Amino acid sequence: IYHDRNAGRLSFNEYDALRLDGKRLIPKGSNIMTDGSIYVLEDDPFTEVVLHGTKADIWFEVKTSDGRTLRYGDTENSRQTVSPSSGSKFVNAWYISRMEDSNGNFMTYSYLHENLTLYPQTISYGKNLHTQNGADNTVNFIYENRPDKCPYIVKDVQGSMSKRLRSIETKTGDALYRHLELSYSMDPGSGASRLSRVQVWKNSDSRQ
């Protein structure tokens, strides 16, 4: 309301407001949702967001005030793409796919897609743009079906949050460093999944 002077609904077009991690993007200039459009965060004018591409291939490059460069949706895997019953498919959300610091260290992200929902699947780190050396480190997220699915609608397409996190593994190459196992109970009042236990394994040790 503060920026738009109204509380209108989503139109799923170029005039909808854009947000980065919940913060409103403010256009610099009159160009919006076109290749090369520039935005800033509403509470951080020193973080610049540049739009690249067109239509279903749009992605965003974020340059932060502390020297990091982040990419959102520059891979097909990191986009929530919706195919409505009428009209063209469109991207509803762009997820982080890469982060690089000012020294060239970088991380990449990949996602599991199911029922319109994206779940973080692998985070890879330990490499540097300026050297050929570096560790091949990964954090892997493993999911299971949840009995308390959470349905939702994007335009006329139904999605569902149907997975919950079962375990997390951290590795260097093929060597397992740590494994976390999550257990759940069901809330007797709401019927919702409730985290009840986390077990951690490192080498042959375990603890609760």
Segments and roles (model prediction):
Residues 1-208:
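Conserved catalytic cores of ATP-dependent inositol ring kinases
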